[in-house]
């Protein structure tokens, strides 16, 4: 045990020393510069989101995925994107309540709009509020679950008002009833490419039902949530030491690795520390994070010979072929890179509360920057060793932020993707979800998670 602690101390000393030598200035100065950028970017991202809500010619409450109308055309609203964006806005005191109410009103409208799939899992709607009728991956059943989560967040913010009881509750119950009906059925994933049973979708559903139990105190929601959790457990692959993204694939993109950053996004957004179920700091999620990062570090040219203060650029999944315009080779995304920032900081928050055990499952996560032997080691919440580990992991988390800063435009714009070859932005301009993901990551960095 003593030798393990000694190695840890030596590793930490060497880590700090090497960074200072390579960068030629202290890490603290770099942190101050990063903090200054974060403060400015937070404001830019907030305003960018508002700019994409109710743009000219659209109904109030319409949340555009992007203002880009060609190459690519993202001037639509997705149930998922809108819910996840407004979920973040509802957590910010500077958000006007009218913005949230407009979102609710528009969502109630599209709940009752005729659609091709004749269900609440219709993913995409036109700028005039009508359903999109073109060929698409339908249904996408994470959408109603994410909307229910956001409805409950808004209801809790607005307290016991007539608006909550008369407007939000009936619409919320409609989404919850839908989840109870369809949770066992395959559907398309959040990337709209694979028809099957998905870790992300099930995590969204179980979180919506757990929140609903807290809100309504009805046992049917909790009992179904626990049944969903039993199904989610099966996504863990002990042979591969990571969580596979999809089971029971019926059609769609080929993902032989089974790796997908949406697994980590699900942990960030839908896990609860109270339940302790696939949380960001849990062994299996950390192991999955390590496997995904390792994969992207090898397949993206911009991840070769990285500057020491930059983190690995993260995409959706290794086999991705969507380049933001068409099919070729997939790229890193801003929102997926931000997911790593959020994951790391949420994990650190857990360790501060419960302590940390390094074991055979999560070893791949920690062995990248710590000397790890084959023994399980537990660090208590108040131990100096854990504090030093957290310092190391926070430096690694901030490298992902530095990557976002490095590849965005100087004016704070963030598109959907940035090139795997040269890092320049491509795809839909100022993707609303990119900006929301950044704000959510910074909330986690500040210790004020949107999720929990």
Swiss-Prot record:
Protein family: Belongs to the glycosyl hydrolase 15 family.
Positions that bind substrate: 136
The protein's name in its UniProt record: Glucoamylase amyD
Residues bearing glycans: 23, 217, 411
InterPro entries named among the record's database cross-references: 6-hairpin_glycosidase_sf (IPR008928), 6hp_glycosidase-like_sf (IPR012341), GH15-like (IPR011613), Glucoamylase (IPR000165)
Molecular function per GO: glucan 1,4-alpha-glucosidase activity
GO terms for cellular component: extracellular region; fungal-type vacuole
Reactions catalysed according to its record: Hydrolysis of terminal (1->4)-linked alpha-D-glucose residues successively from non-reducing ends of the chains with release of beta-D-glucose
Highest taxon of source: Eukaryota
Gene Ontology terms: biological process: polysaccharide catabolic process
Entry's EC annotation: 3.2.1.3
Subcellular location: Secreted
UniProt xrefs under Pfam families: Glyco_hydro_15
Described purpose of this protein according to its UniProt entry: Consecutively hydrolyzes alpha(1-4) glycosidic bonds from the non-reducing ends of starch, resulting in the production of glucose. It also has a limited ability to produce glucose through the hydrolysis of amylopectin alpha(1-6) linkages.
Enzyme class: hydrolase
Active-site residues, record numbering mapped to chain: 189 (proton acceptor), 192 (proton donor)
Induction text: Expressed in presence of arabinose, cellobiose, fructose, glucose, glycerol, maltose, pullulan, soluble starch, or xylose.
Residues spanning the signal sequence: 1-24
Keywords: Carbohydrate metabolism, Glycoprotein, Glycosidase, Hydrolase, Polysaccharide degradation, Secreted, Signal
